[in-house]
């Protein structure tokens, strides 16, 4: 049996920062990091996001392998906890911005189209805790 795809069909892959990059050079924890650091037993063989698949350090080789496999697009996430320096002011971390710039430049050079998302297991844990406080207080006042 032969399956024919349209000429404009895009072969792609997907990953997320927390599942691929590891926690290298990040100033903040996201909810995935926090879960691992507080309950490592919840993770298979206690393996968590600290190293992940090491995409942070191996992205050039990993992207070259994707190109070699015929991948034309990659859905990838930008971790807020890597990109944002100060969560209250929203200032950008230059190290994080440079990392993503290098990743996207490499993808462009290889002819791999990036599809970027901004949320995939990566809500900063600080914001999670703030939202729980803001949600919980009115709930307590209402006796719910």
Which sequence ranges carry the predicted segments?
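Catalytic cores of eukaryotic secretory-pathway lumenal/extracellular enzymes that build
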Residues: 120-130
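Short low-complexity, flexible loop/linker segments enriched in glycine and/or proline
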Residues: 89-91, 129-132
